[in-house]
């Protein structure tokens, strides 16, 4: 199934595979909806090591993140829909773009990550 999903350019959300061709929602609308629905969202290409580091850091501080793994053509469509020259992986906290791994590390090292996560209700504890 994964090989079929990758070949068809589908997007994986957790264990759910979403076929963008079968949806009426445009990529920009889908990105906006996903960012609004979850306090912490990571958009990444499947297997991206930087996204893995981001997930580990967020989990280490007690945050629950929604991770949207993109494959094939879906990755390019969603990346373009992020706008502003955003590249994958891309992190959003409370609907605001943080950036990639460097942005996340900057927040963490400055001591602003946990307070921001607490502010948006993303901490498990």
Swiss-Prot record:
Where is [2Fe-2S] cluster annotated to bind? 48
Which Gene Ontology cellular component terms are annotated?
Answer: cytoplasm
Q: Iron among the record's keywords?
A: yes
Location(s), subcellular: Cytoplasm
Signal peptide feature range? none
Q: Which UniProt keywords apply?
A: 2Fe-2S, Cytoplasm, Iron, Iron-sulfur, Metal-binding, Redox-active center
Q: Which molecular-function annotations from GO does this UniProt entry contain?
A: 2 iron, 2 sulfur cluster binding; metal ion binding
Which Gene3D superfamilies does the UniProt entry name for this protein?
Answer: Glutaredoxin
Coiled-coil region(s): none
Q: Which residues form the Glutaredoxin domain?
A: 28-124
Protein's job: May only reduce GSH-thiol disulfides, but not protein disulfides.
What family does the entry list? Answer: Belongs to the glutaredoxin family. CC-type subfamily.
Q: Which PANTHER family does this entry report, sorted A to Z?
A: GLUTAREDOXIN
| Full protein name | Monothiol glutaredoxin-S2
Which gene codes for it?
Answer: GRXS2
